[in-house]
Amino acid sequence: MIEAPEGLIIVDTGESVDQSRKVLAEFRKISDKPIKAIVYTHFHPDHINGVKAFVSEEQVKSGEVRIYAQETLLDNVVTQGSLVGPILTMRSGYSFGVALSDEDKRDMNAGLGPLAHEGASTFIAPTDTFRDSLDTTIAGLKVQFLHVPSEAPDEIVLYLPDNRVLISAEVTQGPTLPNVHTLRGTKFRDPVVWVASLDKLRAFQADVMVPLHGQPVSGREKVEEVLRMTRDAIAYIHDQTVRWMNKGLTPDELVEKVKLPPHLAGYTPYLREYYGTVKHSVRQIYQGYLGWFQGDPVDLDPIPPAEKARRLIALMGGRDKVLMAAGDAYLKGDWQWAAELSGYAIRVDHDDKLARDIKARSFRRLGYASMNINWRNWYLMSAMELEGKLEGDVALEMSRRVRAAFLSPDMLKNLPARIFLQNWVTRIDPEKSGDVELALGFAFPDIDEAWTLEVRRGVAQLKSGIDPAVPLRLTLDKRYLDTVISGENSLLKGALLGDVKVDGNLLDIKTFLGCFDFEDAPIALTVR
């Protein structure tokens, strides 16, 4: 909360309405001034989902409250969980330890701050956006906005020149080594760009820095020190990874070679590996520059994992000997080796209870020993999967809960029809559509948009507009489409009840819709 002369500015709105109402109650103990502006520093759910705890859509529509963000934020919000939504939500559940027991969460935090709490997610689109920078006055206070891509591509910071205060968003991630790569999966986070953004923050020479995770930093020299050490750590990881890449080292070799020097590794707490790690940052840097192929042609067309495991087990004397060795490694505290050995047996037989038990126990040991919260969560969630506690409806329910945070009903209102239909392209099932050549038009009169989705023998293409020669057409309001996306309704239900107007042969439309795979099946990440 920034208390300006004429009102309040709220920078980021928390992970849910429930939690943010508690925050607002605390703010109201300090000031009863009206809220004049909201700032979204970037599109991640824990920074935007609680907005309606602070303001209403009516206040924003009337102009009473302005919402500031970088110009790409809205696109990022509506696309973050769409194209790769099913796998991203499952992986996010593992990263955040969503299904862990209270016992496994006890005394834990999120690595960069307190654990997030589930609750109602809301969203209101920005009213004021900019590309690179914006100098303005909000509620009588001078504010300088600056776009600084780093932890997110749309990251922005605020500088209050009259107070010499820098609100650094997640360019600094609080008391932890920054997460140059996130295990849940994101597009390449460029360390060079991140370092440049940190240098832009240093140029402010702020007296106080307020990160969106972690404690404020006071004193110009201390602010400079934290920013400099953070940029040097990221630069060191990047530069030394590239240096050794250029000598031919591969990811498995790089992670043993690239380590922070003592003056950086020991800079507590800001560079401790609570959230990011050097090892998984190194791997993504290699991948970002060179891709998956490491140079050994044996990887071009490898033996399938299950067959490879079968051959290795035979070479090692059979399943029993392999699992005896895995059990022996576990008892000796060599948990990584125990997990790897038992994994071969699981590759051959997913229902091998002894192998799953050894691997689960090994992962629990590795998780409890890990200082990094992301690694810990992945180990323990994977152990749950191996123990049979994260299957079927349980896995689907967890995925649904995560999806609700990434794509709430308010966000769906802002999801363009184009994005929704474009997702169909990657849902086409070649077995069902191999002999089909049909096109279906989608008309949305309330937003004056029309699109055509064409199926051509296993390939789908989305086109703008509807050619008069296309005989099949669905006409519906975008408002109704929003309820289809949320799962409240369906196109078939709309056709039966009159919310969707159907033109063309119903059997052809049924054939067309049958070309796509919309089944949400549980995804196993560890038992493979």
Swiss-Prot record:
GO MF, one annotated term: metal ion binding
Annotated binding of Zn(2+) 1, by residue: 42, 44, 151, 170
Reported cofactor(s): Zn(2+)
GO biological process: dodecyl sulfate metabolic process
Residue sites binding Zn(2+) 2 per the record: 46-47, 170, 213
InterPro entries membership: Alkyl/aryl-sulf_dimr_sf (IPR038536), Alkyl_sulf_C (IPR029229), Alkyl_sulf_dimr (IPR029228), Bact_Alkyl/Aryl-Sulfatase (IPR052195), Bds1/SdsA1_MBL-fold (IPR044097), Metallo-B-lactamas (IPR001279), RibonucZ/Hydroxyglut_hydro (IPR036866), SCP2_sterol-bd_dom_sf (IPR036527)
Top EC class of this enzyme: hydrolase
Catalyzed reactions: a primary linear alkyl sulfate ester + H2O = a primary alcohol + sulfate + H(+)
Expression induction: Transcriptionally regulated by SdsB.
Binding site for sulfate: 179-184, 189, 275
Enzyme nomenclature, EC number: 3.1.6.21
UniProt keyword terms in alphabetical order: Hydrolase, Metal-binding, Zinc
Keyword Hydrolase included in the entry's annotation: yes
Top-rank lineage group of the source organism: Bacteria
Free-text comment on the cofactor: Binds 2 Zn(2+) ions per subunit.
Family: Belongs to the metallo-beta-lactamase superfamily. Type III sulfatase family.
Role according to the record: Alkylsulfatase that cleaves the widely used detergent sodium dodecyl sulfate (SDS), which allows the bacterium to use SDS as a sole carbon or sulfur source.
Name recorded for this polypeptide: Linear primary-alkylsulfatase
